[in-house]
């Protein structure tokens, strides 16, 4: 009976350890995806902030040529 009890505890312990490792990997993956999404948004904001400068430059060039 003691052998069965020890074996059961060992199986439960190893199961909990593997579950913990899987949860940690899942959390890391979600963090990487979130960080990548934030990087994409910041790049988009930088590009959108350049549009007024580009438009004014094109307008000045058109005024100079025309």
UniProtKB/Swiss-Prot annotation:
Keywords linked to the UniProt accession: Amidation, Amphibian defense peptide, Antibiotic, Antimicrobial, Cleavage on pair of basic residues, Immunity, Innate immunity, Membrane, Secreted, Signal, Target cell membrane, Target membrane
UniProt modified residues of type Leucine amide: 65
Q: Which domain of life is it from?
A: Eukaryota
Q: Which residues form a coiled coil?
A: none
Which tissues does the record link to its expression? Expressed by the skin glands.
UniProt keyword Membrane, yes or no? yes
Q: Where in the cell is it found?
A: Secreted; Target cell membrane
**For this chain's UniProt record, which GO biological process terms are given?**
defense response to bacterium; innate immune response
The UniProt entry's GO CC annotations, sorted and at most eight, read: extracellular region; membrane; other organism cell membrane
Q: Where are the transmembrane segments?
A: none
What span is annotated as the signal peptide, if there is one?
A: 1-22
Major location category of this protein: secreted
Q: Which residues form the propeptide?
A: 23-46
Tell me the InterPro entries matching this sequence.
Answer: Frog_antimicrobial_propeptide, FSAP
The protein's role, per its UniProt record? Antimicrobial peptide with activity against only a few strains of Gram-positive bacteria (S.aureus and B.megaterium). Acts in a synergistic effect in combination with Plasticin-B1 at doses that are not active alone.
User: Could you say which protein family the record assigns here?
Assistant: Belongs to the frog skin active peptide (FSAP) family. Phylloseptin subfamily.
The name this protein goes by in its record: Phylloseptin-B1
């Amino acid at each position: 009976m003691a052998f069965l009890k020890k074996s059961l505890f060992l199986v439960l312990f190893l199961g909990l350890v593997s579950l913990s490792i899987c949860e940690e990997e899942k959390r890391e993956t979600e963090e990487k995806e979130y960080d990548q999404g934030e990087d994409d948004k910041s790049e988009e904001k930088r590009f959108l902030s350049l549009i007024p400068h580009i438009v004014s430059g094109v307008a000045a060039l058109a005024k100079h040529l025309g």
